């Protein structure tokens, strides 16, 4: 049915439909490209960039944790080393040295009279105290060696104190300060920006099964709107295509006027209405296209800002990772080389020590052993040596001499007298019966003591007169010395 529509009108509609369809197709092509570009940027490009940022942040965290562990470990070791050294010095070494000084002072006060010395020859009693100047117990120990030992200890202690100070200063200046002022500060700044970038600004946590448009309102809005607009393009383009097809059928109708042609069923009234609506449809399509393009512009603007932040953050991370590498290669290496050099000095000792000992422990053990030895030396000198010397030099010799005198004057005398009487009686009884040519028993020499030779009794024998012992000046001096030591 032509419904009063002539051939020229249909041709005009057909030309209009063709032009509009061509323009719509171009517009849809551009719109589709814009949709794909926007979707790629939001769904693929942005997550990839954020994933790379997260990868870089994870690498930074790993390096930062490693560096923090090293710095904290070295700082703790340094503090423990200084503390242990100071504790050992204050708790063990200083008291040990004080104890040694005390016992040496006590040894210096313990006098040793000249008559106690082996190489002193006493020519006259009156000169006993003047032959050799009295000494003290310190004269009989190696004070030079002790002084050398204590001097070496003081040198070692001073060197260790200086080295600990140097290590602490180097630790603070070369390790801790660069770590805290540069590394830690930059790290916290990066993590702050990362947190602002991810959950606050973009609202994304990069979970593998979560798309970004589900997490961010703006991105979600753009993607949902584009999805809806894409669906609107299809029916509008289909309407224009269908309208153009109908116009072509209408043109064929007038050209052939074949009743059997299916175009004979063309509804020119509908065709007229579609032709009238076509500008509005094109306008609506153009509006949809403008929105799609505008969304692409909005997306580029959004991502331009975010990509700039992401690139800046990545650059900061790379710089900090590079600083970490340089920090470990220079600051930490310099400090560790110094530690090794100092440890070598810490391990040097002027005396022999066990493999499981430190020089400080060896010094403390040696000083303690010396103090114990000299304490025993002083104690034995006062309480044992002088008493034993007096006993062996005077008490026991007197006892021995008294026993010997008593034995000679009593037991031996009676024994000799009894033997003499026995022999005399025997000769009187039996001698006349023995020929003179025989040796008579009574004529044999009777055993007798002609001379008694003793040793070790000189100190008491010279003062033994008329069966009594007299105290010599030496004995009196030694006795007085013993009494003095017991006070």
Swiss-Prot record:
This is Autophagy-related protein 17. PANTHER family: AUTOPHAGY-RELATED PROTEIN 17. The keyword Acyltransferase does not apply. It comes from Debaryomyces hansenii (strain ATCC 36239 / CBS 767 / BCRC 21394 / JCM 1990 / NBRC 0083 / IGC 2968) (Yeast). The lineage of its organism: Eukaryota, Fungi, Dikarya, Ascomycota, Saccharomycotina. GO terms for cellular component: Atg1/ULK1 kinase complex; phagophore assembly site membrane. GO terms for biological process: autophagosome assembly; autophagy of mitochondrion; piecemeal microautophagy of the nucleus. Keywords: Autophagy, Cytoplasm, Membrane. Pfam families: ATG17_like. It is a peripheral membrane protein. Belongs to the ATG17 family. Autophagy-specific protein that functions in response to autophagy-inducing signals as a scaffold to recruit other ATG proteins to organize pre-autophagosomal structure (PAS) formation. Modulates the timing and magnitude of the autophagy response, such as the size of the sequestering vesicles. Plays particularly a role in pexophagy and nucleophagy. Coiled coil: none annotated. It is found in: Cytoplasm; Preautophagosomal structure membrane. One of its GO terms (molecular function) is protein kinase activator activity.
